[in-house]
């Protein structure tokens, strides 16, 4: 019988641990962890990374998308020195306009306040996928600047010459000395402005050192680049005209790392290591993700919105399973994917994407069924009415956590510019907060008992079946997975 776990039982009790700890590691591929460490021997393990020490009392977890929205608006209203908001997009809808109006109101009340928004260059200048063609959110930015003044800079950040090949995916809002870290962007569903919402993780951290460190990449590396241009003032150059600048900018980002003064973690404190990454070579965030998984001894929780694990992550998870580690993967059901189209609605090609992810998950579960049956691998699918799922990150044993916008998929691994915060908690000061967060997430999940709990391709809508078969026939499914 497959046991069902809440957050506390998952962390407090593992029926496999006593027997697995008494046995030597499996002989299957016994040198995988050793090979990884040998190849990356210059890379420090998570516990040895330099960190910014902060009081555990200055770290809090917000519970809902509404909390995220209300906290953001309150912080904007109170800010006295700076507001720097990086997001994939700030949408032209009620939620996005509410945030932008709050920024203009704060600037009017305190003219000395420095306010800048950073969005992806390409995403800001196109309409929504699957919708009618439009000039994108940049039209709203210019309209509000003409009406309310140009005191707010909204920068378009081009990571690549084409959106398909990479986007600006940096997270972490900086408001004075506070960092509001979430994978969420700024629109109706992320902010739960109306009835539907898109759930994410939301963390509030008060630290001048962390805020300064994360602000530097925005106010210097981004804003001062010749590839980055304001979208709400003056004329906007064509992407082709800044081609060389974009290439140089991406090259600089691939070498970038956060700079900060590290200090020792004292009683009552946790350590936070900000990480930055772009591309597959020298990517510190990617390395940290794999290192954290390999470091897991007893329990690993992995959040991902789209099941399409990069090869290094999949191999690390398999290694931990073979060595007795208890693994929980929490992801969205295909109906909780933002590209899901109900069978009752007209089908569009983009609607096949959630089914491709589910097919990946089905293959993954089928080949690891023995771990699922033993209760060692727990797969939880999130679904709540017609809302959507966007969580990502890691919880490792009781000492480490990762907050990130990285979807832990090949696209994030290779193409997009990402960041994250590695939390080192040697005194377990945040454990109860992590457990409470996990319980809230699991409340709307169902646990898979077998790969057969998932739909097979034969039950998919006919247009989806045709697309998947066509991709498989020319072996394009693997290529598609690299950019999803």
Predicted ranges, named:
Residues 3-5, 12-13:
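Short, positively charged and aromatic/hydrophobic N-terminal segments
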Residues 26-27, 41-78, 93-296, 335-397, ...:
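HKD-type phospholipase D/PLD-like phosphodiesterase module
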Residues 80-85, 296-301:
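Short, surface-exposed connector motifs at secondary-structure boundaries
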Residues 86, 118, 175, 182, ...:
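Generic beta-strand/beta-sheet core signal
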Residues 89-94, 303-311:
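Short, glycine-rich nucleotide/cofactor-binding loops
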Residues 114-115, 299, 322-328:
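Residues at the starts of beta-strands that form the adenosine-phosphate
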Residues 307-309, 334-337, 409:
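Short, catalytically relevant binding-site loops at active-site mouths
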Residues 371-484:
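Long, C-terminal catalytic modules of enzymes
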